[in-house]
Amino acid sequence: METQVRSGFVQSRLPWLIAAAALVVYGLSLNRWASLSSLPNVTGVAARELTPPISEPVRFLLFLPFRCLPVAWQPAGLNLFAAVCAALTLGLLARSVALLPQDRTREQRQRERSEHSLLSIPAAWAPPLFATLVCGLQLSFWEHATAATGEMLDLLFFAYVVRCLLEFRIDQRESWLTRSALVYG
């Protein structure tokens, strides 16, 4: 019973806690103005033409509400959006790592009787936490998380597709594959 409670925490609550902690950390270190790497997105939002681009239509639609902000607030708003995308990406990474099959050898399969080969030891929280720390504290990830370069949105979509595939492995519902195909494009 205690193992189920612990694994339920690792698979359901821990990703949200990691995402919230990442949002606080990235929010505290948020770039308040446009950086050189975020300049194309900031100028695209600040421009008053509403012609949708041929490439990246989802990014255009998601950045559209930022046009309502005053011009001085647009860079900070876009940077906050990038921080939210980064936090959600780390939450999806934690959930995906928790869903990965852990036991591979025959001896491990005999010892571990869980239905989907999920890690159920007392330290099952360590792999998702370690994965998100390694990814979230990497300099390039941090730079894109605190400035609106657009990379975090792409990475969020990729992380969601991976999560959908791992969720499909667990419960075999085709809705996960449909979501994956929809997000992948």
Ranges and model annotations:
Residues 61, 65, 96-99, 144, ...:
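A residue-level signal for alpha-helical anchor/packing sites in multi-pass solute transporters
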Residues 1-25, 88-91, 115-129:
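Start-transfer (signal-anchor) and selected internal transmembrane alpha helices
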Residues 132, 177-185:
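Membrane-interface alpha helices of multi-pass inner-membrane proteins
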Residues 46, 50-76, 80-84, 91:
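Short hydrophobic/aromatic helix or loop-helix immediately within or flanking a transmembrane segment
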Residues 24-42, 146:
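Helix-to-loop transition at the C-terminal end of transmembrane segments
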